[in-house]
């Protein structure tokens, strides 16, 4: 009976391995190009002046660049963990949107899909700096997938309605503010 209980959670193993692979990969990434631009902002101006200036240039990116500013002022290890979690959650949400059951095959497939996206677009992700690019494009992708997942669950069952609506609105706002 106990073995069957653990067998139900076997589908989670690929996601744990994915997180560890991503964390190891992030360890080799440093700051470059746009990352350095956002990193040096505190030496040049204060955050409010920067936000006002960026609003005039590209108003829809204020929220994401505000987050980017604070992430880059923190130790890089914070971004390693957050970005690895975001990519892992993208794989989990892809899995959940495709298949709601605890199926090992689909969890492996979802992780392979996520890794193939990362490694096939490695050059594009790093072209403007990994931190900047992933926060500007991958994190909103996560928000969009989260909104789709919540919408899918919300239409399927009517539990935690207020919580789902709040998370859906936040995810949609995060996704919309990315462009």
Residue ranges and their predicted role:
Residues 2-5, 95-106, 154-162:
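Membrane-interface helix-boundary motifs at transmembrane edges
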Residues 19-56, 68-69:
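Extracytoplasmic loop-helix module adjacent to an early transmembrane segment
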Residues 19-21, 113-121, 172-177:
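Aromatic-anchored segments of alpha-helical transmembrane domains
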Residues 163-179:
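Membrane-interface alpha helices of multi-pass inner-membrane proteins
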Residues 108-152:
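Membrane-interface micro-motifs in multi-pass membrane enzymes
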Residues 84-104, 146:
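Transmembrane-helix motifs of polytopic, lipid-linked glycan transferases
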Residues 54-77, 81-85:
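Short hydrophobic/aromatic helix or loop-helix immediately within or flanking a transmembrane segment
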Residues 1-19:
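Start-transfer (signal-anchor) and selected internal transmembrane alpha helices
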């Amino acid at each position: 009976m106990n073995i069957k209980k653990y067998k139900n959670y076997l589908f989670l193993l690929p996601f744990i391995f994915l997180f560890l692979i991503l964390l190891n990969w992030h360890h080799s990434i440093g700051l470059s190009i746009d990352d350095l631009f956002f990193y040096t902002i505190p030496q040049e101006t204060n955050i409010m002046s920067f936000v006002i200036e960026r609003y005039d240039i590209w108003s829809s990116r204020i929220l994401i660049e505000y987050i980017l500013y604070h992430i880059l002022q923190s130790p890089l290890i914070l971004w390693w963990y957050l970005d690895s979690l975001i990519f892992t959650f993208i794989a989990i949400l892809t899995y959940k949107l495709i298949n709601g059951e605890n199926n090992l095959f689909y969890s492996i497939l979802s992780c392979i899909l996520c890794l193939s996206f990362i490694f096939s677009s490695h050059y594009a992700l790093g072209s403007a700096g990994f931190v900047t690019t992933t926060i500007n494009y991958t994190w909103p992708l996560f928000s969009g997938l989260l909104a789709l997942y919540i919408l899918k669950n919300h239409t399927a069952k009517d539990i935690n309605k207020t919580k789902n609506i709040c998370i859906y609105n936040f995810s949609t706002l995060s996704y919309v503010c990315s462009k």
